[in-house]
Structure formats: structure tokens, C-alpha cells
């Protein structure tokens, strides 16, 4: 049977979404320079890649964990210390999650209802970390998700449950190793999904990818307006439960606006492993994504950072090298976001657990930064530190 001539390309809905997406990037309120626009197109490229991949990976009966965001498909102020995976769910089906626990600082699970939209954060129906499941001496674990009543090893999928999000979080990049995790429907094991090789399915997937792309861009341009930009520049909020319902995580958020002659000193107590096995700080661009965290030190965990003799960590955010260990490079971004996260908490945090911020002239740093002499780092030491970041990241194999 001859193939009929194409009257409308199957990719037309996605092509239209792509044209609209380019306008969203160009009209973003923070775009004031060629560099802003160029970075926006890098962000757009990653979002295109992710939207196409996720549209083709959508499968609720034969689910697999797919990478939600990563170094080449950033979104939502992605944490440089975190591996993000998700699988799609039906709220009336039962799933088995099995795997082997790695040595990362935290492993958490979150069931979401729907998806992020430009007007709301999705409801978190269930959220827990691996302390809520049984892990054998060899690291193996198994639990179930389904519509039944909650019990040990079984978590209820509430009405509207749509996605299981998994976060695996590093504190020591060099020493910790990721685990193994798998999801499946036991009633579908050994079967195969129906073939999806018709043009109608392809057209639907292109349309879905286009909708995903636009929603992704609109949402995460609006997200900072809800939680960041309503605060004064060069301040950070007290610790608070992280929006979106992630269990046992608090965060402190802010945005900076600095000249090349200025520095922001962020001083925060080191919570300690007994309170927060994971504590980390990062910078982000106005596109609400992480900066280059592989080749530049734009993030630090408590394990990576220098802790002063008084039990506090002092981070210096600046464009020019201040010559200290806890320099956070803003890599040409005079405006951006800064966030501290505490995870796997054993107690709620109080304002005294949060950061204090001071804006200074960079040449005042030797007088203004406590323990300045001990904090200094040579150029050779700095290059070794960056090389260690590059090597540790490469071993994650996230290309």
C-alpha cells in the first residue's frame, strides 16, 4: 500500500511549540544582554532534549526510571549534588521498587500528583527517605506502591498519583557511590507493551513534547517570583520547609545582585551529620538553573567546604578570585540565585540554624572575613580542587 503524501508534518505541533518557546526565551524579563539570550538558548536546547526524551519515555504499565534533569537538561535550580530520576504511575496499579542502596548521603522518594504548571506546584501525596524502608545488610531493598492501605513496606498511591520522583544526593563527591534502583508492575512482568510504531502515536508524542516544553519554560520562569524575587536582593530567608513537599528537607533561598568589586559573605552553622547528613549551597543563573558546577566551584557541600574553628562555614560569592577555599564563583553572572539545602533532617531547623549575609567591597575581605588567614588557598591548591570536581563528576557517567 503506497504511503499517502504528507499534508501536515507530524512534527508540526512541536515545531509550533518550539517557535513559541523561542519567544518565551527572548521575552524573559531578566534578558538585557547578548549573553543572557545566549544562555537562554542553551537552556532551551536542554529543555527541547528533555521534552522529547520524556514524551517517548512515558509508560505507566512498563515504567522505567528516566533522568528528570541533568547537566545537559537543567531545570528548576537543579542541585549539583543530586541525581534526579522519575517514573510515571497509575493511581490504581501496584508497583514494586527494588534496588541496592549506594553510599550517597541521602536517598528519597516522592509521589507527585500531576506536574508543575505556571500557576501551582504539584501536590506531594507521599514523601519519604530510605529510613522508612527495610534495607538488608548487603544494601538490597524492596517496597511496593499501590492503591491499598499503607503498611510496612507498602506505600499508598492516593487519587491522582502520577509520578514517582527519586533523588540520590551526594555530599562527598569523591567517596560516595550511587546505588541501583528499578521499578516494575508485577502483573505485567514478562509481558511487553503493545507496539507503538504508527504515525498517530508519533504525532501524539510530538504534541505532548511541545506541551511539556512550554510548561517547563513558563513554570520555571514563574517559580522564582513565588519563592525568591519577592525578597530583597542580597538577603536569604530563614530555613523553611522546601516548597513542593520534599520530606525532611529545609532550604534557605535568596538572590544576589553584585558588582565585580563586591562580595557577598554567607555565614551558616555547619549542622553536623547528626542533624543533617546533607548540607549544601549553590548558585544559579536567572534562568533558574545551576551554573557550571563541573569546571567551576559554584556549589559546595559541608563535606567539600572549609568549616571554621567556631563551627561555621563562610562562603564568599564574588566574580574575582578572593583567594579563599570557600569561594563560590559567579562566573560572570552579576545577578543570580543562591540556595542552601539541609536534607535527611532529624529535627526542624530554627532561624539560628540559617545564614547571615554581609555585602562588602572585595578589597575589605582580609578585614571582614573571620579566620581569613586560615581560609586562604593558593592557585595550585585551587586548580587541584577543581580537577577533583571534574574527576568526581565524570565518574557519575551522566553524558
Predicted regions and their residues:
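A compositional/structural signature for long, glycine/proline-rich flexible linkers
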Residues: 1-399
Amino acid at each position: 500500500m503506497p504511503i499517502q503524501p504528507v499534508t501536515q508534518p507530524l512534527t508540526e505541533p512541536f515545531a509550533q511549540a518550539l517557535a513559541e518557546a523561542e519567544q518565551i526565551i527572548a521575552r524573559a524579563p531578566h534578558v538585557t544582554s547578548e549573553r543572557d539570550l545566549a544562555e537562554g538558548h542553551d537552556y532551551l536546547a536542554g529543555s527541547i532534549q528533555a521534552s522529547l526524551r520524556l514524551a517517548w519515555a512515558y509508560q505507566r504499565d512498563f515504567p522505567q526510571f528516566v533522568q528528570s534533569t541533568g547537566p545537559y537538561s537543567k531545570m528548576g535550580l537543579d542541585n549539583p549534588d543530586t541525581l534526579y530520576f522519575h517514573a510515571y504511575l497509575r493511581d490504581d496499579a501496584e508497583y514494586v521498587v527494588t534496588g541496592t542502596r549506594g553510599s550517597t548521603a541521602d536517598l528519597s522518594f516522592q509521589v507527585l500528583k500531576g506536574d508543575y504548571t505556571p500557576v501551582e506546584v504539584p501536590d506531594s501525596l507521599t514523601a519519604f527517605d530510605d529510613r522508612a524502608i527495610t534495607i538488608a545488610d548487603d544494601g538490597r531493598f524492596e517496597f511496593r506502591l499501590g492503591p491499598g492501605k499503607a503498611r510496612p513496606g507498602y506505600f499508598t498511591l492516593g487519587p491522582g498519583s502520577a509520578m514517582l520522583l527519586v533523588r540520590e544526593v551526594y555530599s562527598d563527591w569523591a567517596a560516595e557511590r550511587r546505588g541501583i534502583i528499578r521499578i516494575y508492575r508485577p502483573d505485567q512482568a514478562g509481558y511487553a507493551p503493545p507496539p507503538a510504531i504508527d504515525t498517530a502515536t508519533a504525532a501524539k508524542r510530538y504534541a505532548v513534547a511541545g506541551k511539556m516544553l512550554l510548561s517547563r519554560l513558563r513554570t520555571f520562569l514563574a517559580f522564582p517570583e513565588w519563592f525568591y524575587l519577592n525578597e530583597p536582593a542580597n538577603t536569604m530567608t530563614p530555613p523553611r520547609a522546601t516548597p513542593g513537599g520534599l520530606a525532611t528537607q529545609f532550604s534557605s533561598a535568596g538572590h544576589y545582585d553584585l558588582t565585580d568589586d563586591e562580595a557577598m559573605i554567607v555565614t551558616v552553622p555547619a549542622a553536623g551529620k547528626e542533624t543533617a547528613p546533607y548540607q549544601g549551597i549553590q548558585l544559579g543563573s536567572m534562568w533558574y538553573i545551576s551554573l557550571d558546577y563541573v569546571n567551576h566551584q559554584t556549589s559546595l557541600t559541608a563535606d567539600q567546604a572549609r568549616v571554621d574553628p567556631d563551627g561555621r562555614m563562610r562562603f564568599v560569592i564574588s566574580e574575582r578570585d578572593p583567594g579563599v577555599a570557600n569561594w563560590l564563583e559567579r562566573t560572570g553572572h552579576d545577578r543570580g540565585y543562591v540556595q542552601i539545602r539541609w536534607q535527611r533532617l532529624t529535627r526542624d531547623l530554627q532561624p539560628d540554624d540559617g545564614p547571615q549575609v554581609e555585602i562588602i567591597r572585595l578589597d575589605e575581605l582580609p578585614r571582614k572575613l573571620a579566620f581569613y588567614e586560615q581560609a586562604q588557598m593558593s592557585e595550585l591548591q585551587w586548580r587541584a580542587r577543581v580537577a577533583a570536581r571534574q574527576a568526581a563528576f565524570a565518574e557519575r557517567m551522566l553524558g
